[in-house]
Amino acid sequence: MIALIQRALSANVVVDGEVVGEIGPGLLILLGVEQQDTEQKAQRLCEKVLGYRIFGDENDKMNLNVKQAGGSVLVVSQFTLVADTQKGMRPSFSRGASPAEADRLYQYFVAQCREHGVKTETGLFAADMKVSLVNDGPVTFWLQI
């Protein structure tokens, strides 16, 4: 399971001209689900993402996690993160979980974020989404479990 996390001043997701998820300061989390992923991996990745200290403290040192910084998260499914790009000029998505399993684990990841007490917004699984982000920094990390 892969999470590409971006520290955001704001972010939103639009589907069919309608905003379906929106946050102020916090994290935009692009989530890719691989074939061998499990609920345990989703839980571990969620804990890592929410615990990752990439927000500035009183000395402007990256020392606070999203909850400590008072931020929220916007979780967006992103199957292209699991692409194999090593050969040729076209990505292969054979490592990706089936759509049903990817949706199940995506929803599980979202539920875990909410259980940790972090305000959590989402995109719409498998939809054609327009994602907007004001990246703060920019600060972007690739986390994989």
Curated annotation (Swiss-Prot):
Single annotated GO MF: Gly-tRNA(Ala) deacylase activity
Present the record's domain note: A Gly-cisPro motif from one monomer fits into the active site of the other monomer to allow specific chiral rejection of L-amino acids.
Example GO BP: D-amino acid catabolic process
> What Pfam families does its record include?
Tyr_Deacylase
This protein's major location comes to cytoplasm
Cited NCBIfam families: D-aminoacyl-tRNA deacylase
* Function of the protein: An aminoacyl-tRNA editing enzyme that deacylates mischarged D-aminoacyl-tRNAs. Also deacylates mischarged glycyl-tRNA(Ala), protecting cells against glycine mischarging by AlaRS. Acts via tRNA-based rather than protein-based catalysis; rejects L-amino acids rather than detecting D-amino acids in the active site. By recycling D-aminoacyl-tRNA to D-amino acids and free tRNA molecules, this enzyme counteracts the toxicity associated with the formation of D-aminoacyl-tRNA entities in vivo and helps enforce protein L-homochirality.
What is the name listed in the Swiss-Prot or TrEMBL entry for this protein? D-aminoacyl-tRNA deacylase
Which SUPFAM superfamilies does its entry note? DTD-like (SSF69500)
**UniProt keyword annotations, A-Z:** Cytoplasm, Hydrolase, RNA-binding, tRNA-binding
Q: Which gene encodes it?
A: dtd
Q: What protein family is recorded? A: Belongs to the DTD family.
Q: What is the lineage of its organism?
A: Bacteria, Pseudomonadati, Pseudomonadota, Gammaproteobacteria, Enterobacterales
Report the EC code(s) recorded for this entry. 3.1.1.96
Matching entries from InterPro entries are given as: Daa-tRNA_deacyls_DTD (IPR003732), DTD-like_sf (IPR023509)
Its recorded reaction(s) are: glycyl-tRNA(Ala) + H2O = tRNA(Ala) + glycine + H(+); a D-aminoacyl-tRNA + H2O = a tRNA + a D-alpha-amino acid + H(+)
Q: How does it assemble?
A: Homodimer.
| A GO cellular component annotation in the UniProt record | cytoplasm
Q: According to the UniProt entry, where does the motif Gly-cisPro motif, important for rejection of L-amino acids sit in this chain?
A: 137-138
Q: Where in the cell is it found?
A: Cytoplasm
